[in-house]
């Protein structure tokens, strides 16, 4: 018995390789007697595909599984929508790194066939939600699977802010900003900023300062249930931006307050059977193999 009956397809736009893999995947799914629905934006690059179309939010409501063909950015974008319906997501890598999209396009029929036959592993990944308040009123909100980043925007200047964890004062800082990362995001921008790699099963949030004007500032790891609050200094000349996964952003003003916490909804991420997180790290990050290999 197949665990999935209705499959949604989302593809990376502007990538001929992704389109090629999408067409190949559609042909394969057509042999499996499954209902297939194509994301309406993806459908613009799949002329005459012959399948029903729907928005991403509707895909989450209608589908048992959504397959994303693209890079990690494509999956991050889909995750922020599909987490609302807890729809399982499976990634086929047609990007660069592919930390989250772990099926090779060369193995698409074999590996996806195994998943459709019920041979897969699933895990829950939490997201972060950021809110910006001005004079006590919410002026913006956004969420991210990888991270929430506070940065000065286009201006190359430092910003001043105060950091609080669960209402307790941590420090005041002048820096280029702060990366607040999930375990999923610990191998993304936070890694470039000198943050630790955090196993995705850990319920933890990492805070990584960006070029702090101090010799003693280091990344901090806190419980994922923590509430992170940032008070933007009123004397800042820059208008700090709050960026989620590098894809959505809210512009703040000096004096604003930002609150970041774990989002209630989680992403259900599907992997082929035998998925190994540390093997992924070795492959994607260029870690050394065992001696003699």
Curated annotation (Swiss-Prot):
Location of the active site: 72
Superkingdom of origin: Bacteria
Compartments reported by the entry: Cytoplasm
Binding site for NAD(+): 72-73, 146-147, 157, 174, 176, 187-192, 247
Catalytic activity: NAD(+) + ATP = ADP + NADP(+) + H(+)
UniProt-listed Gene3D superfamilies: Probable inorganic polyphosphate/atp-NAD kinase, domain 1, Probable inorganic polyphosphate/atp-NAD kinase, domain 2
Function: Involved in the regulation of the intracellular balance of NAD and NADP, and is a key enzyme in the biosynthesis of NADP. Catalyzes specifically the phosphorylation on 2'-hydroxyl of the adenosine moiety of NAD to yield NADP.
Name used for this protein in its record: NAD kinase
Gene: nadK
């Amino acid at each position: 018995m197949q665990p999935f009956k209705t499959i949604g397809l989302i593809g990376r736009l502007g990538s001929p390789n992704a389109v090629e893999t999408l067409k190949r995947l559609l042909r394969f799914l057509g042999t499996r007697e499954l209902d297939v629905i194509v994301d309406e934006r993806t459908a613009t690059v799949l002329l005459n595909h012959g399948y029903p179309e729907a928005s991403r939010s509707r895909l989450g409501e209608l589908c048992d599984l959504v397959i994303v063909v693209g890079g990690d950015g494509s999956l991050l974008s889909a995750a922020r929508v599909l987490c609302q319906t807890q729809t399982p997501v499976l990634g086929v890598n047609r990007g660069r790194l592919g930390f989250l999209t772990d099926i090779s396009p060369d193995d698409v029929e074999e590996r996806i066939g195994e998943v459709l036959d019920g041979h897969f592993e699933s895990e829950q990944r939490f997201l972060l939600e950021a809110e910006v308040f001005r004079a006590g009123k919410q002026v913006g909100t956004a969420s991210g699977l990888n991270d929430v980043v506070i940065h000065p925007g286009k201006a190359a200047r430092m910003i001043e802010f105060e950091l609080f964890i669960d209402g307790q004062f941590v420090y005041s800082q002048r820096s280029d900003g702060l990366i607040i990362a999930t375990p999923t995001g610990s191998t993304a921008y936070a890694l470039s900023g000198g943050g630790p790699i955090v196993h995705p099963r850990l319920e933890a949030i990492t805070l990584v300062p960006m070029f702090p004007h101090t010799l003693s500032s280091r990344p901090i790891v806190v419980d994922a249930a923590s509430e992170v609050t940032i008070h933007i200094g009123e004397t800042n000349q820059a208008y700090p931006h709050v960026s989620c996964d590098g894809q959505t952003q809210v512009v703040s003003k000096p004096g604003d307050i930002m609150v970041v916490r774990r989002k209630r909804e989680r992403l259900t991420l599907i992997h082929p059977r035998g998925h190994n997180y540390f093997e992924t790290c070795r492959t994607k990050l260029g870690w050394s193999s065992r001696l003699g290999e």
